[in-house]
């Protein structure tokens, strides 16, 4: 029986053949998807592909709400803010 942390389906199972001829199961975290805008669902532009390996300062664009909202949502919000 695998340990409790490995029973979850959020962990990927890979069958590996050992030099001794046995087949064992290795567990690894599933790859995360591209970060998406919560409003439009578009992928956020300017984000590094290796998102979770780097800190937020390195991977996110330097614009306001960079790394959170897509450029279309930001442009719309800025236009509304200027008009008020």
Swiss-Prot record:
InterPro entries: Ribosomal_eL34, Ribosomal_eL34_CS, Ribosomal_L34e_arc-type. Gene3D superfamilies: 6.20.370.70. The keyword Ribosomal protein applies. GO terms for cellular component: ribonucleoprotein complex; ribosome. Keywords: Ribonucleoprotein, Ribosomal protein. The keyword Ribosomal protein applies. One of its GO terms (molecular function) is structural constituent of ribosome. Coiled coil: none annotated. It comes from the Archaea. Transmembrane segments: none annotated. GO terms for biological process: translation. Belongs to the eukaryotic ribosomal protein eL34 family. This is Large ribosomal subunit protein eL34. It comes from Pyrobaculum aerophilum (strain ATCC 51768 / DSM 7523 / JCM 9630 / CIP 104966 / NBRC 100827 / IM2). The gene is ribL34e.
């Amino acid at each position: 029986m695998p340990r409790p942390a490995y029973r979850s389906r959020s962990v990927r199972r890979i069958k590996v053949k050992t030099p001794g001829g046995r087949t064992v199961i290795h567990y690894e975290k599933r790859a995360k998807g591209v970060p998406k805008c919560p409003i439009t669902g578009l992928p956020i532009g300017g984000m590094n592909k290796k998102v979770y390996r780097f800190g937020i300062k390195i991977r996110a664009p330097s614009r306001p709400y960079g790394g959170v909202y897509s450029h279309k949502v930001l442009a719309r919000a800025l236009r509304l803010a200027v008009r008020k």
